[in-house]
Amino acid sequence: MCSIFGILDIKSDAVALRKSALEMSKRLRHRGPDWSGVYSSDKAILVHERLAIVDPGNGAQPLYNPERTHVLAVNGEIYNHKELEKTLKVDFQFQTKSDCEVLLALYKEKGPAFLDDLNGIFAFILYDAEQDAYLIGRDHMGIIPLYTGRDEHGNFYVASEMKALVPVCKSVETFPPGHYLWSKDGELKQWYKRDWMEYSAVEHNVSDKAELKAALEAAVKRQLMCDVPYGVLLSGGLDSSVISAITKLYAARRIEDDGKSEAWWPQLHSFAVGLEGSPDLAAARKVAAHLGTIHHQIHFTVQEGLDALRDVIYHLETYDVTTIRASTPMYLMARYIKAMGIKMVLSGEGSDELFGGYLYFHKAPNAKEFHEENVRKLASLHLYDCLRANKSMAAWGVEGRVPFLDKEFMDVAMRLQPADKMCGKGKIEKHILREAFEDLLPHEVAWRQKEQFSDGVGYSWIDSLKAMVEQEVTDQMFEAAAFRFPINTPLTKEAYFYRAIFDEHFPLEAAARTVPYGKSVACSTPTALEWDAKFKEMADPSGRAVMDVHQQGY
């Protein structure tokens, strides 16, 4: 994982701004500790902090076209870069073996209208010195974070994380997923549009489990593009187990040369985190033994988790309760992974949104509502699980990849017949995915019920959090929450506690507005609360709150 930082539309002293840019970019260096690169002129400044994953020896950024008139800073991976290079219609002399350099070639051929050609995870700034123009883009799901802001002089800032903007900007915003900004027209434009975003486009489709299985296997294989040691996150739940099982199928050969040579690190390492005796650790051991991975159990204590909260909120840049609960164990695990020399991991985020895996989906009244909730969940995922998967790993210089959110696979998964995904009436959640991959997993894992990550690492983790905040946040403090936090006023003492820490790190009103807000049960959207009157009465967002829903489905 890398970071990018840019100052564009420069209206003040460029020399002073260059010094400031270098200082602000240091705040992002945890994302890219391997090398720093900078481009600066009177019109634009781009700084890149690199985590070397592909072409470690020659892929330093910013990247340039041969004429050095186009400058590119990217945080991401372009999984289909080789295919794109073969289809280029313009002559372009590549300078490196970096997967990201193809963006410069595509820009030469198509101008700004190339983003939908990409299959990958990315956030980038491309500066065209010939036209004094810039292009900013973010991947389809917002897997890679990106923020923008303006200072008091009107200079335009772009950064991978908000912490590099808050000290210098008066305003900050999240750059929306699936969009680009081309300075020549000054408009944010949505490049990621799919037919399946409308129920009418999929309601008569016929599901094909064989196609689903092949598409996910292809997605995992694509995402093994890597020139450094990698591993898998294995909680023992369905999603991480499926990704781990597929990864194991391809781990012995190098993906980069189409399997012609042996992998540089053929032994697959898997990682699980939890409190002593947690459900996840037991399930993960079973899967690891079945797959034959070199398995690592990371135990943490409740006190270690509590001690990490302030750092977790700083790195995650959120005060969302479920995100912080789940991110804390992942943040602790990432440190262990980094110490092992692993620089990239694959994980299972996105499956629950694609297949309706959360327990509240049992209450979906019909296929249309089920599908539309899938679409809503995917649209907001960059504020929750994508943010967690990226930033909790990037805090320690580890890159997280999420094959379920592969652009090509998503098209297959979201074009399944929605009725075939529905749970309830004797069907467990994500049954179509379980059926497709049950041959790769132990039966009890393939059919293990969904648990939220923060529950699976050990129930006492959440219980201890609640007990701690009861001591830290008095009734008097909570009663005055609306006065202290008029924007997105905390609804619980736990939310109050996290919000207070967030505001210490990011004392800017606009920063608070970047965090999602509203009532949720088991990760539902506000719309889905209408499915059951009891949902509105539940105070805790944990999946445990709707455990009875699962039982009622049988």
For each feature predicted by the language model, list its residue ranges.
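Adenosyl-5′-phosphate
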Residues: 1, 339-346, 365, 370-554
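Cysteine-centered catalytic environments shared across enzyme families
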Residues: 1-319
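Hydrophobic (often cysteine-bearing) scaffold residues that line and stabilize catalytic clefts
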Residues: 17, 80, 96-99, 118, ...
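Short, hydrophobic alpha-helix immediately C-terminal to the catalytic nucleophile
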Residues: 104-105, 241-248, 331-335, 356, ...
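Short, basic, helix/turn surface patches
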Residues: 125, 321-333, 375-378, 473-479
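ATP-dependent adenylate-handling ligase core
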Residues: 209, 273-334, 360-369, 391-392, ...
